[in-house]
């Protein structure tokens, strides 16, 4: 069977990790990377050495020339175009483009990739107007005539599978989410200007920083039955990877905490295996580093006030889990052709 050929625009945190996922997949082939700000030798260095996920150990990575990287024997074209419509995706056969710059996140901007020969674009961020899909929740609603999609956010990917299970089994009347979230690249190493978000400009390594997030509201887009029932906020904390969702909900149908645990466990071992996880051990954030699942329910951490009011806790590697889902979404899109 022919491999799915993908290109990556933007070789930042998600771009590089999507590349790692793709290069470890038998059915996906990375054919090109575009980044106007990074030379090929620096790309090689950034790919090989990763503070969080460790050194790349699968095969040698080296520069063939200024426009080609070698991953083992595999050649990957490198482009340096600032304007997406100028990237010659068609010349290397890249059918699917992962848009991971964080810049071209609406349909119109992302559509520029189609002019260069790409067939489909997956935006690795929430989008104001592109249809959003969360694998394990609503990917089956994807139709093959949709050319531009959003993989939502890492937090929505954690929250939505859990919310779906709880709503399907017990019904959610309303809920509030807090994500305790690791540092990301948009934050500051020392206090610096951040005119749109004053608190967000404070030193990331020294502060717990309250922040806004659209992740809970976005669940209403991928699960319309929950539209208007969830909202939430974020605390940015001084860790480099792995985040945790605290979902506090009022249930329609009364349930014991043990019944809730059993429902989540059944789905984690059944239809959502590989997407939703379930743990009863006494784990902490670093134990989930490199976990490819979207959401790992922490059975011991949750609490119930009564049969209708519960707090549920679910972990996620906000980098690796999310990057794995980007590739899974591409696989699903390809299967509908």
Swiss-Prot record:
Active site feature: 154
Catalytic activity from the UniProt record: D-glyceraldehyde 3-phosphate + phosphate + NAD(+) = (2R)-3-phospho-glyceroyl phosphate + NADH + H(+)
Key words, A-Z: Cytoplasm, Glycolysis, NAD, Oxidoreductase
Any one biological process term the GO annotation gives: response to anoxia
GO molecular function per UniProt: glyceraldehyde-3-phosphate dehydrogenase (NAD+) (phosphorylating) activity; NAD+ binding; NADP binding; phosphate ion binding
Region described as Binding to NAD: 1-151
Compartments (UniProt record): Cytoplasm
PANTHER family: GLYCERALDEHYDE 3-PHOSPHATE DEHYDROGENASE (PTHR10836), GLYCERALDEHYDE-3-PHOSPHATE DEHYDROGENASE GAPC1, CYTOSOLIC-RELATED (PTHR10836:SF112)
Function: Key enzyme in glycolysis that catalyzes the first step of the pathway by converting D-glyceraldehyde 3-phosphate (G3P) into 3-phospho-D-glyceroyl phosphate. Essential for the maintenance of cellular ATP levels and carbohydrate metabolism.
Quaternary state and interactors: Homotetramer.
Misc. remarks from the entry: Plants contain two types of GAPDH: cytosolic forms which participate in glycolysis and chloroplast forms which participate in photosynthesis. All the forms are encoded by distinct genes.
Listed name of the protein: Glyceraldehyde-3-phosphate dehydrogenase 3, cytosolic
